[in-house]
Amino acid sequence: MNPQDLKTIVSSGLLSFPVTDFDEQGDFRPKTYIERLEWLAPYGATALFAAGGTGEFFSLTGDEYPLIIKTAVNTCAGKVPIIAGVGGPTRFAIACAQEAERLGAHGILLLPHYLMEAGQEGLIAHVEAVCKSVKFGVIVYNRNVCKLTPESLAILADRCPNLIGFKDGVGNIETMSSIFMKMGDRFSYLGGLPTAEVYAAAYKALGTPVYSSAVFNFIPKTAMDFYHAVASDDLATQHRLLRDFFMPYLALRNKNPGYAVSIVKAGATIVGHDAGPVRPPLTDLKPAEMEELAVLIKSLGPQ
């Protein structure tokens, strides 16, 4: 896919990132992953991120990665575009990016590199190397150890024509506003904070209405309803869902580090689309927490 075509796709609508299915031994389980994608595809997400953050990219091996991307691309062909997660050390990110391109993904989401903090010059070199290793579109994820400044993004935009998107996982409105004012329509902008619905209205007011939804994995109808409420400035629906579901959901999610992923897999299990356990160092929700989440989900009605 042409980078500009990808930019157009991710400039509107709701995005999501399916969890990655594992069996009880923690190995990739293609059968239920296919079933998951087939279930989610018709609900109307503009694109799906395979092996993204919620898809536990950080826990995958180089041998598993191609099978996961190939499964997603083949399952969703003609239904919804697949954007592959890549990240980690520069050379590993490049290897994943090139493999995703070979397998037919429509672009990549570049997650942060591994562990070490780096200055802007090093971050620019890392992102530039990945962008120049492929021809299709790249979205950079500003989060954790990769926090690019407006000036750094301007340099990258000039050097890398296929860098078409910026996903924010920091939540600093001043920084986000500075980036948006400086770069304008050079990028597509995606809200990428955990449980992005909580911040969606604020980001829309800034001029960046697109975000990725984790809860789409288990309450896809509600996720789409909330997105449409934000798009139409339906504050009554937004506030009702924030008050009755998202705030209690946040309280449960925040009980343990890493639950931002674990709670999504738990939700999928509760609604009958079991994705298996998370991989260490993440931990699954405790039984009482599962019951608490089940009550919240049931209150939303059929999906």
From Swiss-Prot:
InterPro entries: Aldolase_TIM, DapA-like, Dehydro-deoxyglucarate_dehyd. SUPFAM superfamilies: Aldolase. Pathway: Carbohydrate acid metabolism; D-glucarate degradation; 2,5-dioxopentanoate from D-glucarate: step 2/2. Its EC number is 4.2.1.41. Pfam families: DHDPS. Belongs to the DapA family. This is Probable 5-dehydro-4-deoxyglucarate dehydratase. The lineage of its organism: Bacteria, Pseudomonadati, Pseudomonadota, Betaproteobacteria, Burkholderiales.
